[in-house]
């Protein structure tokens, strides 16, 4: 829950402040309670969330393209601050979003801050293949990890993207102890604290 203009502005500002080291983790929100804080009576359904997210990313990138890299001249002697011919009006009108632009921040140093995504569902994988540069994943075994890798990479061509434009970063959940036996006992104890009904409700 956010507006593309706000995200584009915040990420562009962070990219400027960090010298081109900003990244944006695109999250579609999972909990219906979040909707109540943003003027909605119900959460978007799964398909709509990812469809909106795809459009959202394209709008944010369009806002980052509001200005050419050299649009801001800032010449005190001439009194010229910017070259208006290097401004690009977005004028986006889509199914979920309507954004005029331009962004009121210069183009980020990276052009586009790094876009990250972590969806594991079919629609999440499509979003990753279409828009992301980095994908977080947490497969339960090597075979599942290889299958996820090949599946997401295999979807990229239809979006006009090369496979090497996306990095997939597997997660690791470690249980640390002095011995294997102690680690397994600790893991089983932690698993016992999970209440199935609470998990389903969340």
Question: For the regions a protein language model found, what residue spans apply to each?
Answer:
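Conserved, mostly hydrophobic/aromatic
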Residues: 14, 24, 60, 115, ...
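Active-site mouth loops of central-metabolism enzymes
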Residues: 1-5, 41-43, 47, 109-122, ...
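Hydrophobic faces of well-ordered beta-strands that scaffold small-molecule active sites
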Residues: 20-26, 113-118, 133-137, 166-173
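Active-site-proximal loop/turn and secondary-structure-junction residues that shape catalytic pockets
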Residues: 1, 28-32, 64, 121, ...
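Hydrophobic or amphipathic alpha-helical targeting/insertion segments
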Residues: 1-37, 44-47, 52-56
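Short, acidic/polar
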Residues: 7, 117-130, 189
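An alpha-helical appendage that flanks or caps ligand/catalytic pockets
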Residues: 47-110, 143-202
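Acidic (Asp/Glu)-rich catalytic clusters
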Residues: 15-21, 129, 157-163
